[in-house]
Amino acid sequence: RTAILANEIFNNYEKYSGVSIWVGAAAFTMQLYTDFDGCMDIVLGISECFGIRLPENFSAPFLSRSIEEYWRRWHISLGDWLKNYLFYPLLRTKFFMNLPKKLKGKLSKKGAKQATTFLAMLILWFTIGYWHGGAWTFIIGSGLLHWFYIVSGKLMEPLFVKWRAFFHIEKEKKGFILFQRVRTFFLVMIGLVFFRSATVPDALRVLGRGVSGLGLDWTELMILAVSILFSAWVTIHNQKEDMRVTLEKKSIWLRWIALYALLFYVILLGKYGPGYSASEFIYQNFKV
């Protein structure tokens, strides 16, 4: 039944927007999972009729708390095969063995090792995407996008640790575990929008429809994301040292550039920005 909903929305995405798009994406995600996992269950069942027990190929992937964990639970046989016969042998080739030495001086020892691993992972994830099909929708949706998720997650992990400490978030609390699972499902779902779409431009348009129907276009969404990240960074920085004190230690040119950049940011996106209305100031409705 999910196929009917997914096909209708993806084949006629111009007619839908906002929540409807995400419902269609979720429907296709579940369609793909139940179809693939159901097929494997049939294979396992037939094998057991002949006294052969095959290993499970899925292990509740949508309970995963990260993309890495998701791929340890999804299509397990493919992941194991590619790790053992592509990824690890690739890292043992002469080129990859010598790459950290070539990067010495340009990156730290840890950074050189990370860069080497990330490059090998890029080849691995490109191969995974290509295995699903030669089209760029598969290469991006099942491969490169997941590589980006994993690499960016590893690079930003120190920042995530600081955020959790600042907001007093315990990793094993049920609420945070639920957040991680929903986040992982959503990231997988974005990849499957590419997977399901006929072309990459179609996938981008589908995602655009999903955002526009929420009352935000891509520009506004990026501004919102940058503003939130910047505010979070300043908040965390202020726990160590007041931002004004930090700026006072910088050169006068850097101080003025920072101040004018923030001033124009506020003016262009506030008073003179699109959609601004003085009547929308929230606190005007509250009494002091």
Walk through the language-model features, giving the residues of each.
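Membrane-embedded transmembrane alpha-helical bundles that form the catalytic cores
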Residues: 1-288
